A protein has these predicted regions:
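Metal-dependent phosphoester/phosphodiester hydrolase catalytic core
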Residues: 103, 107, 174-179, 186-188, ...
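Short carbohydrate-recognition loop motifs
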Residues: 52-70
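Secretory/extracellular carbohydrate-interaction modules
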Residues: 65-148
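Extracellular carbohydrate-recognition regions
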Residues: 24-50
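Bacterial Sec-dependent signal peptides at the C-terminal "C-region" and cleavage site
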Residues: 3, 15-28
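Carbohydrate-binding surfaces in secreted/extracellular proteins
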Residues: 88-90, 160-201
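Flexible glycan-contacting loops in extracellular carbohydrate-active proteins
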Residues: 194-231
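Short, aromatic/His-centered strand-loop micro-motif at the edge of beta-sheets
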Residues: 143-170
Length: 659
């Protein structure tokens, strides 16, 4: 949206494909996992699916579960059409020798993994390719896992070695014709180099190109909820003319940054992956002077749960753009300590601009991941501020569902989804100030009434659990989520935590003469079931007794929306026109009205997944307004009070879900 400080406001929707240059590298790729101890993050050249199910442990890669579709993709190297051949090999073995008798599955390679958007990130998360490896039956295979090899394979010998020292799997291209190419898979004794068996087949040339991955793929839930390690891998090597190197695709150890600049203070949050305990826990921030000299301006400890380092620097004496870099010295696998830099630019406050451009986002699902159309087109507009109004992640994001407990696994599960957000928007975030605020799905809720931070009483029925009000997840986990998304915002107006010690972040920020109030319209909101009659049969915030109730029956004088603390903040904010403020804008998760419509026969939103998607310009027949109390049209009394305060500042409202 474009915000003109002269007169009116023009709202435009900015939805944003990018290609990266490659280096045709003749050197072989060789994995290096010889780190001391354990580390969840595999390294800057890899993406693991999912993050919490893999680790480096004493010099090798391990899959920590016996479950379906676990993989580690190489993101800096690809197989491409321009070459003619490649070879690839890895050592592989069973972590648990009893796996052969208990599980059906396989381990090995994925060749030519591709998604639907022709992007290496999409390939790494959703790509499908040619499987090639060894099954728990002892058969080698390429492509069709259900077919048994006809070659004379000594299956017992293969499985015995897999259970002991492991074997070396080697795949290479063979003969080729115009349309097809031969793939040959061989198994070797890892110690002696003796060839144990081989299997070959012909594959369409076009499907060999794409990402390369290691994979452990077993029947789901063999061990129920028990996490049982399955396979280890080591010495992954690839070479050949089809192999191309993209060094700029490295992801980490600084994954991405977010920053704000307001009233002479800049705050920058750097996001890190789950590094091992033996890695350094401090990062520093440097600014570049006019003489291109870098000066250290802050050093911070990486928070052990959110894996963030947040820097705060007074920049009131630096009115222009400020080149910055986050500096981290660490120990990559197989190397001495190295120093990595992640650079960006803190933009000058655009107070001299007549028009301020704001790109606003909400509901960042992964249907179009990595959203290259969105990011490229947004950058064409060169916005002055990015605003993410909630649901930066959804529970199913990236596949594999979501983890509610234990807290350590739930944390890594969330971080993987959050890293995907940074993978999408990182190039914008490093150079453009941004606001992010958390909504329900960010904290693993379908709907949320924060009720001042109370603990929601657990219930097997998710709707009942949410209707109780408060947070389902532990407070330390909620605080972790908020640190990842909001710690770069200006300091909160009143930092006192709410119930359970859950932190707050509501604040104000000045950009280009516009004062933005950033509020939390979910954290204090009362759950309707706590204050409304049982006769309304409230389920997940919907009165299911009737399609439409008298609005007066649904209102409650007791129910809160923003709470006393945020109302006091807004009363202060609307009266404060300091710091060259000439316009005001409010940022919230949800609009202060109930505008959703549903068919007149529906009593809740459970029908939504079954509704027909209308064409542009077409409106559904028989739709009428809803009484969804997850929206901020409810509670009406508290909503009206909030609007009365906000209108005193003539504030333009930027909000997310309807809800």
């Amino acid at each position: 949206m474009i915000m003109s400080k002269k007169s009116n406001l023009l709202i435009i929707f900015i939805f944003a494909v990018g290609a990266m240059a490659c280096t045709n590298q003749t050197e072989h790729f060789n994995s290096t996992w010889d780190l001391p101890g354990q580390q969840t993050w595999i390294g800057a050249h890899y993406w693991s699916n999912p993050l919490q199910d893999w680790q480096i442990n004493n010099g090798r890669l391990e899959c920590l579960v016996t479950d379906a579709n676990r993989s580690v993709h190489l993101i800096t190297w690809m197989l491409e059409e321009s070459g003619t051949h490649f070879t690839m090999q890895t050592d592989v073995g069973f972590i648990d020798s009893s796996l052969v008798a208990k599980a059906q599955g396989w381990g090995g390679f994925v060749i030519g993994a591709s998604g639907q958007f022709n992007d290496y990130r999409d390939n790494a998360v959703y790509g499908k390719g040619i499987p090639a490896g060894i099954k728990t039956s002892g058969d080698l295979f390429i492509g069709d896992i259900s077919a048994n090899a006809k070659d004379d394979q000594d299956r017992g010998k293969l499985l015995e070695k897999m259970s002991n020292d492991g074997i070396t799997l080697h795949v290479e291209t063979g003969e080729a014709n115009q349309d097809e190419i031969q793939l040959v898979l061989k198994a070797f004794d890892k110690n002696t180099g003796e060839q144990l068996t081989q299997f070959s087949t012909w594959i369409e040339k076009r499907i060999v190109n794409g990402n390369i991955a290691l994979k452990a793929d077993f029947e789901q839930e063999i061990y129920g909820d028990v996490r049982t390690p399955s396979l280890w891998f080591d010495n992954w090597k690839i070479s050949g003319s089809k192999l191309h190197y993209y060094p700029q695709r490295k992801f980490g150890p600084v994954l991405f940054t977010q920053y704000t600049r307001s009233k002479g203070i800049t705050k920058i949050t750097a996001q890190f992956p789950p590094l091992g305990e033996k890695q350094p826990d401090k990062a520093s921030l440097e600014f570049s002077s006019e003489a291109d000299q870098w000066e250290k301006v802050d050093e911070e400890t990486i928070d052990p749960m959110s894996l963030t380092a947040t820097f705060k620097v007074d920049v009131s004496d630096k009115p222009g753009d400020i080149p910055y870099r986050v500096v981290y010295t660490w120990l990559p696998a197989g190397k001495e300590k190295v120093t990595d830099y992640y650079a960006g630019t803190i933009r000058k406050d655009p107070v001299d601009k007549e028009i301020i451009k704001v790109a606003a986002f909400t509901g960042n699902n992964d249907l179009g991941f990595p959203n290259t159309e969105v990011t490229q087109n947004v950058l064409m507009h060169d916005p002055d501020l990015l605003v993410y109004t909630g649901d930066q992640i959804y529970e199913p994001r990236g596949g594999f569902g979501h983890v509610l407990s234990p807290v350590d696994l739930a944390t890594i599960d969330y971080l993987r989804k959050w890293y995907m957000f940074g993978w999408e928007y990182g190039e914008m975030l490093r150079n453009i100030p941004s606001v992010a605020i958390t909504d329900d799905h960010d904290v693993y809720h379908g709907n949320i009434w924060g009720a001042g931070g109370k603990k929601a009483t657990p219930d097997p029925n998710q709707k009942v659990w949410q209707d109780d009000g408060g947070y389902k997840m532990p407070p330390e986990w909620v605080n972790m989520v908020e640190r990842t998304q909001t710690s770069h915002l200006p300091d909160p107006y009143d930092p006192a935590p709410v119930k359970q010690g859950i932190s707050v972040y509501y604040t104000d920020m000045n950009v280009g003469g516009i004062s933005f109030a950033i509020i939390e319209d979910r954290k204090w909101k009362t759950n309707p079931k706590a204050v409304l009659p049982e006769s309304l049969k409230i389920s997940n915030g919907w009165p299911e007794n009737s399609r439409f109730n008298d609005p007066k029956l649904l209102d409650s004088k007791e129910a809160e929306l923003l709470g006393d603390r945020q109302e006091a903040f807004l009363n202060h904010w609307v009266a404060d026109w300091s710091h060259q403020t000439i316009m005001k804008s409010l940022i919230s998760q949800t609009i202060f009205a109930t505008i959703a419509t549903l068919p007149d026969s529906a009593i809740s939103d459970v029908v939504v997944p079954r509704l027909r998607i209308t064409k542009p310009g077409e409106y559904p027949e028989n739709d009428i307004p809803t009484q969804d109390m997850d929206s901020n049209g409810w509670p009406k009394t508290a909503r009206d009070e909030a609007v009365k305060i906000i209108r005193k500042g003539f504030a333009f409202h930027i909000a997310g879900d309807q809800h």
